[in-house]
């Protein structure tokens, strides 16, 4: 009987946590609808608000998802299932935003976004990432589950379990793979593309999560590990900001310069 009560309590906490994340998604969605209606003739302000709300939603849900996954050590597939599901949710609800400075950088380098618009989106992501800490802190202070009470302090939990060069390689490689897929899946049907990207993100988290957390998103990393940035800024700056940016740069160089050059050389050699 005691075991059943403990299991029931665990299920209640899990359902409450899932409900909290879905509520954040719903409220952010309603705010986006209002923003679209009110700011149709101000593209900069419109882009800022949408990017802010998208980053806020992503960071808040990831805070709660990380907390929930830490409480289920006996179910190794449970966190991955949640990651896949909420990646689908974000993919369906955050259309037109990136919630990732690396995504903005990629669009600017490929000529798909002006520097001014890029700066506005980056600022929105920064504010959204920092604002999510206050938002999720206020929600946790309500003590809706037993997990929230013990996690409200946002103490630094260093996710880097390898030395610095390996951590840089992991984050750069994750960023390279994800954004390469993002770039090359443009022609895939939207419904299928969302599932493919969700599966890819889940795989990357599974492969690199135990090494660095496999964040490959500077804004999300700042929100999740703000205290760690304060205590070991240089290490976290290199791993979570520079490394994903390096992955983007390598991806651009490969697909925009190296592969076309290789193809042209091959074509010339065949003609000769």
Swiss-Prot record:
Q: Which GO terms describe its molecular function?
A: channel activity; glycerol channel activity; hydrogen peroxide channel activity; water channel activity
Instruction: Share the record's PTM remark.
Output: Not glycosylated.
Signal sequence range: none
Lumenal face: residue ranges?
A: 36-47, 97-167, 217-235
Q: Where is this motif: NPA?
A: 217-219
Q: Where, per UniProt, does this protein localize?
A: Endoplasmic reticulum membrane; Cytoplasmic vesicle membrane; Cell membrane
**What gene name does this entry carry?**
AQP11
Could you tell me what this protein is called? Answer: Aquaporin-11
Q: Which family does it belong to?
A: Belongs to the MIP/aquaporin (TC 1.A.8) family. AQP11/AQP12 subfamily.
Q: What is recorded about the protein's domains?
A: The NPC motif is essential for oligomerization and water permeability function.
- Residue ranges annotated as Cytoplasmic topological domain: 1-14, 69-75, 189-195, 257-272
